[in-house]
A protein has these predicted regions:
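Feature activates predominantly on carbohydrate-active enzymes
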Residues: 11, 15-21, 44, 87-304, ...
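Short, Φ-rich (hydrophobic/aromatic) sequence segments
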Residues: 44-52, 117-127, 309, 342, ...
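Substrate-binding groove of N-acetylhexosamine-processing glycoside hydrolases
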Residues: 1, 5-15, 19-22, 27-31, ...
């Protein structure tokens, strides 16, 4: 493909299935273009005109016939028979196209209307890389491997429970439209919009459950202190959700609401704490705190609320609803009604029984054309008996799709078992949560494992390479779709690009080839090389890893304490400096696009944070070494302690000054947050005070938080290494896409 397109190759992502170069070139004039359209709907024709104007064509003229047009687009019976036959040979003809550039213009034949639009975005992507409008003569025949290519960005994420909002959750309508344009031009055809926590839309029947006037403490650089503000979701300030659903649908993009099945379901559990699942005295004595999200399904008020919620969401125009089971794995509601109904069952079987019951109830009230899906059965044991899967399959409404199937666990054998039990047509998503892990870890560069030490490479698994292997395995086994959980956009665009590439053309590129191509697609040739290099080398360290007295975070369990840890951190310091130099060079480039600048700037903030965390860890290790060696030079120990605290505070300053939502929240009665550096600072002070006295007195009132997503995932401490060692058998069954 790159040979056929030459210097234009990086402009296309996903790369086409087939491109053949011909002789000559065609020059398109930006001041005017004559267009002939046949067979498209009015909405599709409107998208054609909108895209051409966006591409810079000043005047659009309608040609009387195909031969008089600079650009001819046709679908249906007007497509020559030989081209229809060629498109029908592809996996999904209705989304496929043939684009021919030559003879003074371009012709697009679509297997369906959306296929024609994909041909158009391919043409315009090429033209965006041609300042003079000249393109090589080329013949492209192209179509997707997977019918549904989905990404899951966040509209809200644990809002009113663990977070107020960050990243995409703060976007207004125009920014969401720009993102939908990005998805359309990268041939993504569904968005699974995450709405966890207080609802980001009006809900007159339950106004207390929407994200309005939430009290949030945010940092003021001007006064150097926290201030309390009132936060209302952008869609409630200036509604845009229904408009962007229509806008996306016009571009062939389905919009799904991704919500909790019985947890984080709007603000009801916070506004009505009596409605929560109840913990037994035994569980309370054991220290359980995480009943703040789950609702008691035996209560009539809860059932009425949940039914009203799904009906309201459908009313907004969503094309489907994707429900997620609670991630709790150790207990189920202990109220008398639940004990009577489910007390004879293990906690997870009780949870699944309620899930089935709710899904049947939702099916009754939702329209037949509304897609219904579920993420469930995700808890240990990861490897489940076939009979267990078959039992739950038979209880599930046939209409319900699966938005979770196993990742690489058990060398993909568990995934292949799910394909056989549930059928590939029912599987729309696997466990592709690399960007979700990055968000859970507090917006750090958790992208590829190349930057991890060997001890963590043997543990880490939810990264970009893992996502790609899962996408390929889903394509190989004929699954209906693939889905990338894009919970973090800024600086993590590669996860979205991977979903676009591997859902469309799963075998065109190795992982390394994809990274090289995607980096240059995003930043151009010179800056793309810089970006690829820094992604391969930028260290990824969670704050808890530089503190030996805090519990291990489930996703990043190892500690960089001791001689080996200090040496690793010293190597990382040099890598962080090198990455920062590359980022400064990128940001100094004239004429960066808004997307390029926001990506580079977000990555720069992450790199600066990594440098400060690394330096804090280095000085803390040096302090421990001096102390443990029995050296009693108090002045030297104080210098090391001060340096460790300075760099830890610098990390916290970067967080507070560049992100909106950074302080722990106690709306649920439990301190919850995503940034652990205040705890690290307090633990450092405890260590220093033992030897150096009151000057380092810790804050006795410091909040010790639980992570918004980390509590139910402690089982990963056992399973992480097994998953990291797993072989992606479903993804290596042959580059021809052999079926399982």
């Amino acid at each position: 493909m790159s040979d056929a397109l030459g210097r234009y190759a990086y402009s296309l992502l996903p790369v086409p299935q087939r491109a053949v170069r011909a002789e000559g070139e065609v020059v398109f004039r930006r001041d005017s273009i004559t267009v002939y359209i046949e067979g498209l709907s009015a909405a599709e024709s409107g998208v054609v005109r909108s895209e051409l104007r966006e591409a810079g064509f000043e005047r659009l003229r309608t040609a009387p016939g195909r031969t008089e047009a600079d650009l001819a687009i046709a679908v249906g019976e007007s497509v020559p028979r030989i081209d229809r036959e060629r498109l029908n040979e592809l996996a999904h003809p209705e989304q496929s196209y043939r684009l021919t550039i030559g003879d003074g213009g371009a012709t697009i034949y679509g297997g369906g209307g959306i296929g024609a639009l994909y041909g158009l975005v391919t043409l315009l992507s090429l033209l965006r890389e041609s300042p003079d409008g000249a393109l090589p003569a080329v013949d492209i025949v192209d179509g997707p491997d997977a019918r549904k290519r989905i990404v899951s960005p966040t509209l809200t994420w644990y809002a009113g429970f663990a977070r107020a909002g960050f990243g995409t959750q703060l976007w207004e309508g125009p920014r969401w439209k720009a993102f939908i344009d990005w998805c359309f031009r990268h041939k993504i055809n569904a968005l699974n919009l995450v709405m966890y926590g207080f609802w980001p839309f009006e809900f007159p029947e339950y106004p207390e459950t929407v994200l309005r006037d939430l009290k949030v403490h945010t940092w003021s650089k001007e006064i150097g202190d926290w201030i309390e503000v009132s936060f209302t979701h952008p869609n409630l300030r200036k509604p845009f959700l229904e408009e962007i659903i229509r806008y996306a649908n016009d571009r062939g993009i389905d919009m799904y609401a991704y919500i909790g099945l019985n947890s984080y379901s709007g603000g009801y559990p916070v506004a009505h704490p009596e409605s929560r699942g109840q913990l037994s005295r035994e569980l309370l004595d054991q220290g359980h705190v995480n009943n703040y999200d789950s609702l008691c399904a035996s209560r009539k008020d809860v059932r009425d609320y949940l039914i009203a919620s799904v009906k309201r969401i459908e009313q907004l125009g969503f094309n489907g609803l994707v429900f997620e089971e609670s991630e709790e794995v150790q207990w189920f509601c202990q109220c008398e009604a639940c004990k009577e109904k489910y007390g004879h069952l293990p906690p997870n079987d009780a949870k699944h029984s309620v899930s089935v019951d709710l899904l049947w109830a939702y099916e009754e009230v939702l329209r037949p054309e509304t897609m219904i899906a579920v993420r469930w059965l995700r808890e240990p044991p990861i490897v489940k008996d076939r009979a267990v899967l078959e039992t739950w399959r038979d209880k599930l409404p046939e209409r319900v799709k699966l938005f979770w199937a196993p990742g690489l666990e058990d060398d993909d054998r568990e995934f292949l078992k799910w394909v056989e039990v549930f059928g590939p047509e029912r599987i729309w998503s696997r466990n592709c949560e690399g960007s979700g892990f990055a968000a859970s870890l507090g917006r750090i560069p958790y992208i590829i494992p190349d930057t991890f030490p060997e001890s963590l490479k043997n543990y880490a698994f939810q990264h970009l390479w893992n996502d790609i292997s899962q996408f390929q395995g889903a394509v190989n086994t004929g699954c209906e779709g693939i889905n990338g959980y894009g919970f973090e956009w800024y600086g993590h665009e590669l996860f979205f690009m991977a979903a676009a590439q591997y859902g469309w053309n799963a075998w065109a590129q190795t992982q390394g080839e994809f990274l090289a191509h995607a980096a240059r697609h995003l930043f151009g040739e010179a800056n793309g090389a810089r970006y690829e290099r820094l992604i391969r080398t930028l260290p990824c360290i969670h704050e808890t890893q530089i503190c030996d007295t805090l519990p291990s975070f489930p996703f990043m369990p190892n500690k960089y304490i001791g001689d080996e840890g200090r040496r690793y951190l010293e190597d990382c310091e040099m890598a962080a400096e090198s990455a920062l130099a590359d980022l400064e060079a990128i940001l100094a480039t004239p004429g960066l696009s808004a997307l390029q600048r926001e990506s580079a700037e977000a990555t720069r903030i992450m790199a600066l944070r990594m440098r400060e965390v690394i330096r804090a860890g280095i000085f803390f290790n040096r302090y421990l070494d001096e102390r443990d060696q029995g050296r009693n030079d108090a002045e030297r120990l104080e210098r090391l302690a001060d340096c460790a605290l300075y760099h830890a505070e610098e990390d916290y300053r970067l967080i507070k000054e560049h992100y909106f939502d950074t302080k722990e929240h106690c709306w649920t009665g439990v301190a919850i947050g995503e940034y652990y550096i205040p705890q690290v600072i307090n633990e450092y002070k405890k260590t220093f005070a033992e030897r150096l006295g009151e000057r380092y007195k810790p804050n006795e009132d410091a909040a010790y938080i639980v992570g918004g997503e980390s509590l139910p995932w402690e089982w990963l401490l056992e399973w992480g290494p097994k998953i990291a060692r797993a072989k992606p058998h479903a993804a290596i069954r042959g580059r021809e896409g052999a079926k399982a």
